[in-house]
């Protein structure tokens, strides 16, 4: 017999019919349609933005501001050791990382993180390296030039 496209149908219970609201008290959601009685939220077209507290000073304005966003972090890319295998050659610099599409073109700095294995000896020029990554690079025979 076999399976045919024109004989396919959804499994039993897979498609529930939508609950029609406000269509008689026998439906279980008649009259007020599950909205309760009166008030702003019972009216059509009403939507109260999240964080609105009825006019009192909201929590996000009662609490003090703190911290800042570092502009340096916005232009510093993070590169994993495992991603370095995509680079042609054994010299790693900002230019070679951009050429291999490992970092975005607008990045000015890069930092190499310890994640994965180093496959060969790389020479790093002008790139920051974490402590763990430095140990892994030197263990593989690589070097770091500031």
UniProtKB/Swiss-Prot annotation:
<keyword id="KW-0694">RNA-binding</keyword>
<dbReference type="InterPro" id="IPR036227">
    <property type="entry name" value="Ribosomal_uL15/eL18_sf"/>
</dbReference>
<keyword id="KW-0689">Ribosomal protein</keyword>
<dbReference type="InterPro" id="IPR021131">
    <property type="entry name" value="Ribosomal_uL15/eL18"/>
</dbReference>
<protein>
    <recommendedName>
        <fullName>Large ribosomal subunit protein uL15</fullName>
    </recommendedName>
</protein>
<dbReference type="InterPro" id="IPR030878">
    <property type="entry name" value="Ribosomal_uL15"/>
</dbReference>
<keyword id="KW-0699">rRNA-binding</keyword>
<comment type="function">
    <text>Binds to the 23S rRNA.</text>
</comment>
<dbReference type="GO" id="GO:0022625">
    <property type="term" value="C:cytosolic large ribosomal subunit"/>
</dbReference>
<dbReference type="InterPro" id="IPR005749">
    <property type="entry name" value="Ribosomal_uL15_bac-type"/>
</dbReference>
<comment type="similarity">
    <text>Belongs to the universal ribosomal protein uL15 family.</text>
</comment>
<feature type="region of interest" description="Disordered">
    <location>
        <begin position="1"/>
        <end position="55"/>
    </location>
</feature>
<dbReference type="GO" id="GO:0019843">
    <property type="term" value="F:rRNA binding"/>
</dbReference>
<feature type="compositionally biased region" description="Gly residues">
    <location>
        <begin position="24"/>
        <end position="37"/>
    </location>
</feature>
<dbReference type="GO" id="GO:0006412">
    <property type="term" value="P:translation"/>
</dbReference>
<dbReference type="Pfam" id="PF00828">
    <property type="entry name" value="Ribosomal_L27A"/>
</dbReference>
<dbReference type="GO" id="GO:0003735">
    <property type="term" value="F:structural constituent of ribosome"/>
</dbReference>
<comment type="subunit">
    <text>Part of the 50S ribosomal subunit.</text>
</comment>
<keyword id="KW-0687">Ribonucleoprotein</keyword>
């Amino acid at each position: 017999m076999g399976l045919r496209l024109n004989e396919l149908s959804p499994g039993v219970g897979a498609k529930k019919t939508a609950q029609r609201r406000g269509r008689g008290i026998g439906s279980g959601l008649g009259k007020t349609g599950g909205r309760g009685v009166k008030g702003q939220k019972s009216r059509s077209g009403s939507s109260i933005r999240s964080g609105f507290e009825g006019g009192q000073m909201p929590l996000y304005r009662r609490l003090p501001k703190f911290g800042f966003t570092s502009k340096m972090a916005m232009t510093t890319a993070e590169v994993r050791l495992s991603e370095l295998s995509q680079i042609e050659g054994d010299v790693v610099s900002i230019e070679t990382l951009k050429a291999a599409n490992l970092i975005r073109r607008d990045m000015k700095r890069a930092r190499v993180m310890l994640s994965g294995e180093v496959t060969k000896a790389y020479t790093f020029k002008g790139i920051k390296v974490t402590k763990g990554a430095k140990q892994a690079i030197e263990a593989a025979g690589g070097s770091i030039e500031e």
